[in-house]
C-alpha cells in the first residue's frame, strides 16, 4: 500500500477514500474476502453421461450410428431393435445411400416423407433416423401395433395398406415385410409413451449389461 501512495492519483485522495480504494484493490487482486471480482473463474460443467445401450440391441458397426438409433428410439418410444431391422433392410447402414426412386439416407426417406416428419436434411444421419422413427411410430399407431402392416406402410405407403386391407400384393412389399419382421422377431409392437416404452423394451440398463462404445 506504500507503493500506491507514491502514485499521483492516490496522493490526491483523502485518507479514508485512499484506504477504501486500496483495500478493494488488494482484496480483488489477492482474492481475499471477495474473490477476484474482475476475473471470476468459470468452472466447466462435466457433460452428462450417455445412457448405456443394452448389449442385445444390434450394432451397425458404428458407435455414432448406434447412438443415433438408440436415442431416436428412446425419444419416440420405438424399440431400437425394430429401427435397426428397418435400417438394415433399407440401407445396410450406409448413411449416404440413395435409391433410383429418390430415397435418401439410413432410413431411405423420400422428400415428401422427410418434409412430413420435419427432416430438413435427409443426408444428416441423426435427422434422417429421427424422421424415419417418427414415421414408424405413426404407422404403428395407425395400425394398432401390427408390425407387418406398419412395415408394409413404410414400404408401399399407408394408403396401399388401406386399399388392400392388409399387406399389398406387391412382390417387393411382401418380401420386405417378411425379411424385416423375421429379423426383428416380433409381429406386435406396443404403442407406448417413451417412459413406458423404455421399460417395456428394457432400454435402461446398468453399464455391466451394456455394449461398450
Set out the residue ranges of the language-model regions:
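N-terminal Sec-pathway targeting helices
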Residues: 1-19
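A general, composition-driven signal for non-globular sequence regions
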Residues: 5-8, 30, 84, 102
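Hydrophobic membrane-insertion alpha-helices, especially the h-region
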Residues: 14-31
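Signal peptide processing junction and immediate N-terminal pro/mature segment
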Residues: 29-46
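Catalytic glycan-binding domains that act on GlcNAc-containing polysaccharides
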Residues: 41-213
Amino acid at each position: 500500500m506504500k507503493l500506491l501512495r507514491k502514485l499521483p492519483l492516490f496522493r490526491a485522495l483523502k485518507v479514508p477514500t485512499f484506504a477504501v480504494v486500496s483495500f478493494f484493490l488488494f482484496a480483488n487482486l489477492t482474492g481475499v474476502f471477495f474473490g477476484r471480482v474482475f476475473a471470476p473463474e468459470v468452472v466447466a460443467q462435466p457433460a452428462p453421461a450417455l445412457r448405456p445401450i443394452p448389449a442385445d440391441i444390434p450394432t451397425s458397426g458404428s458407435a455414432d450410428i448406434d447412438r443415433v438409433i438408440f436415442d431416436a428410439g428412446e425419444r419416440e418410444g420405438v424399440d431400437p431393435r425394430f429401427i435397426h431391422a428397418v435400417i438394415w433392410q433399407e440401407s445396410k447402414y450406409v448413411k449416404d445411400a440413395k435409391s433410383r426412386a429418390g430415397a435418401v439416407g439410413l432410413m431411405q426417406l423420400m422428400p415428401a416423407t422427410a418434409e412430413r416428419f420435419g427432416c430438413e436434411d435427409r443426408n444428416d444421419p441423426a435427422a434422417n433416423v429421427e424422421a424415419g422413427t417418427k414415421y414408424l411410430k405413426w404407422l404403428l399407431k395407425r395400425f394398432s401395433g401390427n408390425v407387418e402392416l406398419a412395415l408394409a406402410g413404410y414400404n408401399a405407403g399407408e394408403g396401399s395398406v388401406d386399399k388392400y386391407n392388409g399387406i399389398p400384393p406387391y412382390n417387393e412389399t411382401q418380401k420386405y415385410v417378411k425379411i424385416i419382421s423375421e429379423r426383428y422377431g416380433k409381429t406386435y409392437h406396443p404403442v407406448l409413451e417413451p417412459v413406458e416404452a423404455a421399460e417395456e423394451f428394457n432400454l435402461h440398463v446398468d453399464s455391466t449389461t451394456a455394449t461398450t462404445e
